[in-house]
């Protein structure tokens, strides 16, 4: 990644609103940049900081259009503590501690993916979810509008690492979709305290229990957390660099640009 990321002022801004399954109308700003096959980049808890903007640059430079919803927090900098408070206040959108069902915001992202697919005239989009949005990527791969998904350090539900932030119906739908679309990617550090080995085992039990690899996990050495952003090291041969290269190759093989 370059030393200076393209700032948010270099993005095209729009607004997307849609009703979640609970009936709540959700509205957020959307930032777009680049051309090519669309990839929806979902922010992690620290926010859309410089590291996330650098990740977006990597995707744009690889030939993708980045579509980045602004879900919470300041733009251009990280705010872990402040954003945690903000998300806790967005109870109609996020359910941080809930297992066996997802957050309403995941419904909104699904509708966003469908709109992007239809607007761009493509077969489907890619999705990257990170940290508290990581589980959303696992759920969204079950939708026809999503052809490829990456869950980086999926941490929700917090304090329940042996459970998933999605319903049994969601799991079944994603399993069936992955049988057709091929394995998605999950990224995590081996000793991540927020996305633990217990979480890894939970994902494998849910998706790879019958010997069919629906979720391909890329495990990196160390105790980091944010594989593609805060803990990313842009050096040839570094595990995080190799993980990002794998993600780009995965998207390139599964997504097609607009005609």
Walk through the language-model features, giving the residues of each.
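N-terminal cap/leader regions of alpha/beta-hydrolase-fold enzymes
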Residues: 1-259
């Amino acid at each position: 990644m370059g030393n200076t990321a393209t700032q948010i002022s270099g993005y095209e801004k729009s607004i997307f609103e849609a009703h979640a399954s609970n009936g709540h109308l959700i509205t957020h700003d959307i930032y777009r940049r680049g051309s090519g096959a669309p990839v929806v980049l979902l922010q992690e808890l620290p926010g859309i900081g410089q590291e996330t903007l650098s990740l977006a640059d990597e995707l744009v430079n690889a030939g993708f259009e980045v579509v980045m919803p602004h879900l919470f927090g300041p733009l251009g900098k990280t705010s872990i503590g402040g954003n945690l408070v903000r998300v806790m206040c967005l109870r109609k959108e996020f359910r941080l501690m809930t297992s066996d069902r997802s957050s309403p915001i995941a419904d909104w992202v699904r509708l966003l993916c469908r709109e992007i697919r239809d607007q761009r005239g493509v077969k489907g989009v890619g999705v990257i979810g990170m940290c508290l949005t990581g589980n959303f990527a696992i759920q969204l791969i079950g939708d026809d509008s999503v052809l490829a998904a990456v869950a980086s350090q999926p941490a929700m539900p917090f304090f329940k690492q042996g459970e998933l932030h999605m319903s049994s119906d969601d799991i079944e739908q994603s399993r069936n979709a992955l049988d057709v679309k091929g394995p998605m990617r999950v990224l995590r550090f081996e000793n991540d305290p927020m996305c633990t080995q217990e979480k890894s085992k939970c994902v494998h039990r849910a998706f790879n229990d019958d010997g069919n690899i629906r979720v391909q996990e890329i495990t990196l050495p160390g105790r980091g957390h944010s594989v593609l952003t805060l803990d990313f090291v842009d050096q040839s041969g570094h595990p995080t660099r190799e993980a990002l290269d794998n993600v780009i190759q995965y998207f390139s093989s599964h997504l097609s640009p607009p005609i």
